[in-house]
Amino acid sequence: MANTPHGGVLKDLIARDAPRHDQLEAEAATLPSIVLTERQLCDLELIMNGGFSPLEGFMNQKDYDGVVAESRLADGNLFSMPITLDASKAVIEQAGLKPGSRVTLRDFRDDRNLAILTIDDIYRPDKEKEAKLVFGGDPEHPAIKYLNTKVEEYYIGGKLEAVNKLNHYDYVGLRYTPAELRIHFDKLGWTRVVAFQTRNPMHRAHRELTVRAARARQANVLIHPVVGLTKPGDIDHFTRVRAYQALLPRYPNGMAALALLPLAMRMGGPREAVWHAIIRKNHGATHFIVGRDHAGPGKNSKGQEFYGPYDAQHAVEKYRAELGIEVVEFQQVTYLPDTDEYMPKDEVPAGTKTLDISGTELRNRLRTGAHIPEWFSYPEVVKILRESSPPRALQGFTIFLTGYMNSGKDAIARALQVTLNQQGGRSVTLLLGDTVRHELSSELGFSREDRHTNVQRIAFVAGELTRAGAAVIAAPIAPYEHSRKAAREAVQSTGGSFFLVHVNTPLEYCEATDKRGIYAKARRGEIKGFTGVDDPYEAPTNANLVVDVSKQSVRSIVHEIILMLESEGYFERL
């Protein structure tokens, strides 16, 4: 028998509201609406299908305050993660929203009406408190960065009525709601289910870990990977799901099943581990594996872990009785070549030879095409990963040149384009500042905001081309550090590499060699907001390469860039 849902009742709003579908659909078309972001869509789906039971909507202030401070809803139920609907003041005022109002929630992907929210309250959260108590307070934490840069200033709380399910076009047969998964377990005759959370590909160690957990508890295994939002830079879920499917036959027949979870992770470590346990309980699992640094975001810029290695295990242990799902705490496992088996590290006899491949080492082997041994992963899994993560020589990249006008960056960009075209192996795209201004940003001016927008448009195009395997050479002035940082993050979020080249040619040289007389016009006041004259240029603090046309030839600079790319593995090595 499947586990009892958290709070006692599965809050399946889709099933509850199905008899009123036509009425709700008609009403939704008449109401003001809010278009949801990708993270909000993930949250909405799991509220509506009961994955976040006992929630029936986005948290009002009482629930939010209780969860932030004590991991408890206003009714006393344990819930460790704030689930909120953020909106800007402009959206709230434009829609005329207030307590008691009803508002339609829409899908940004296809503009469908998904739900109606009856508003309890509209409140301004204490983001600093939320960051500290929920995520630990480190401003480099991805959830805190998201909170401070993406989340709007107001939260809207209230209960939901489901209008339509979200549409998915990928792996539809693996997307079980909690109710559907419970029926699936019943059909299979499973009464004890160990759930395994992952946002990464699974290898032999993961298979051994889950089999050990199931064997010890006479249970079956639910592989329950996240396919919503994970950590930037993670392997895409399409690749991961193919790898999970390839792994399944390696389990004893009938032992394991695969189901996908449309969760937007927060990488919240201890808080997230408790949240994950609640979610798996709602999906019918009786046991849940919590490993080392569960749902942690890794290390900050100083090389420090955001959480202790076993903080998540301590958190779920603290609430073990309330969670109502048996938490399986597992140490890391390691490979013993002499006996060809995996074993938890704390059980390995002293002096025994062990082998491990870290995540960083695996990425390096995929990048370089180096051998990945079968003791680490199965050939069919490695084949899928290599298809989606080709070696660097087959990947795209972005060279982002920044500097004053007439610093020589355009000449460098053109010469580099010719050199890369001669090299062959990938298409090459040139995004010069003037060209982009004319073709993509003709309506933008030269205010700080417009300049930032222009650079982000360049970054978007560069990221998409880089994802497709092209070499992109961008050469805007890009005078602001925050714009360049955002551009780097945008390109890297697509899985591509971003190389910042600071063309550090002195302003005096740029001005003295300006044959078009642009600087002279700026000095006379005929052009306002001109970089280097009456608008600052913020020198990069993290350039991959610094060059100077007043001291170097364009040819030598291009050669430096080529050598940088070669050292990073972007050209075939004989």
UniProtKB/Swiss-Prot annotation:
Location of the region described as Catalytic in the Swiss-Prot/TrEMBL record: 170-394
* Binding-site positions, 3'-phosphoadenylyl sulfate: D434, T435, V436, R437, R451, I477, A478, R516
For this UniProt record, the keywords arranged alphabetically read as follows: Allosteric enzyme, Amino-acid biosynthesis, ATP-binding, Cysteine biosynthesis, Cytoplasm, Methionine biosynthesis, Nucleotide-binding, Nucleotidyltransferase, Transferase
Which biological process annotations from GO are given for this protein? cysteine biosynthetic process; hydrogen sulfide biosynthetic process; methionine biosynthetic process; sulfate assimilation; sulfate assimilation, phosphoadenylyl sulfate reduction by phosphoadenylyl-sulfate reductase (thioredoxin)
The annotated active site, in chain numbering, is: T198, R199, N200
- What's its EC? 2.7.7.4
**Annotated site residues (Induces change in substrate recognition on ATP binding) in this chain:** F330
EC class:
transferase
Report residue spans for region: Allosteric regulation domain: 395-574
A molecular function (GO) held by this record is: adenylylsulfate kinase activity
Ranges annotated as spanning the membrane: none
Question: Which positions are annotated as binding ATP?
Answer: Q197, T198, R199, N200, G291, R292, D293, H294, V333
Q: Where is this site: Transition state stabilizer?
A: H203, H206
Give the span(s) annotated as N-terminal.
1-169
Control of this protein's activity: Allosterically inhibited by 3'-phosphoadenosine 5'-phosphosulfate (PAPS).
Q: What is its main location?
A: cytoplasm
One Pfam family hit: APS_kinase
Q: What is known of its domains?
A: The adenylyl-sulfate kinase (APS kinase) is non-functional. It is involved in allosteric regulation by PAPS. PAPS binding induces a large rotational rearrangement of domains lowering the substrate affinity of the enzyme.
Its biological purpose is as follows:
Catalyzes the first intracellular reaction of sulfate assimilation, forming adenosine-5'-phosphosulfate (APS) from inorganic sulfate and ATP. Plays an important role in sulfate activation as a component of the biosynthesis pathway of sulfur-containing amino acids.
**Subunit note:** Homohexamer. Dimer of trimers.
The protein depicted here goes by the name: Sulfate adenylyltransferase
Q: Which organism is it from?
A: Emericella nidulans (strain FGSC A4 / ATCC 38163 / CBS 112.46 / NRRL 194 / M139)
Gene name of the record:
met3
